[in-house]
């Protein structure tokens, strides 16, 4: 059964280093902690430059959803700037990552435990169609405007930063309708 996750139900947890906060969107298994999850999807708001936490054995994807840019230095050598031109990055969770920001940014964050599952993150556009590729799929509205997601007998009205978690019992084909073009982040989770 599809689970609608409205933005107003997300709660921010401040980082220990004081450089930002995280709002967990979904986690599996439900109620798992940072050491037990198979996968975790969240929004991270970065307010100050500093290091990321290390997550050994975890594969991560980040996509910039708000703010101008964030410059990431991985393992002291590889520099990547997340911006509108290059909004997404995949990296291993054990990498030493240093973030440099000039203003507040918000990143969509997907983490999967490497020995249990994997993920694929892509940006799609509504209006359009979605053919699911996995038993668990999460849709996140990153753009402005509203999106009506319809699959089988179900339909959900989604606004900016709302999410919809689809499981194996939900339709494989979905229609995403919108009055204006809107960016939708689609996460396929493979277990």
Question: For the regions a protein language model found, what residue spans apply to each?
Answer:
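Jelly-roll (double-stranded beta-helix
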Residues: 1-191
């Amino acid at each position: 059964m599809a689970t609608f996750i409205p933005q107003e139900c997300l709660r921010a947890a401040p980082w220990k280093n004081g450089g930002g906060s995280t709002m967990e969107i979904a986690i599996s298994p439900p109620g798992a902690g940072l050491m037990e999850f198979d996968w975790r999807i969240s929004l991270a708001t970065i307010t100050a430059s500093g290091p990321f936490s290390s997550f050994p054995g975890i594969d991560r994807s980040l996509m910039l959803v708000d703010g101008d840019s964030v410059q990431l230095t991985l393992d002291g050598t590889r520099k990547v700037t997340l911006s509108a031109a290059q909004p997404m990055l995949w990296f291993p969770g054990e990498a030493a990552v240093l973030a440099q920001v000039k203003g507040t940014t918000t990143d969509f964050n997907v983490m999967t435990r490497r020995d249990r599952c994997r993920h694929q993150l892509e940006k799609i556009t509504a209006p359009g169609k979605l053919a699911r590729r996995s038993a668990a799929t999460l849709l996140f509205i990153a753009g402005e405007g509203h999106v009506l997601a319809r699959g089988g007998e179900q339909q959900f009205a989604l606004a900016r930063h709302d999410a919809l978690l689809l499981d194996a019992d939900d339709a494989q084909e979905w229609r995403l309708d919108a009055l204006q073009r809107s960016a939708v982040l689609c996460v396929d989770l493979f277990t």
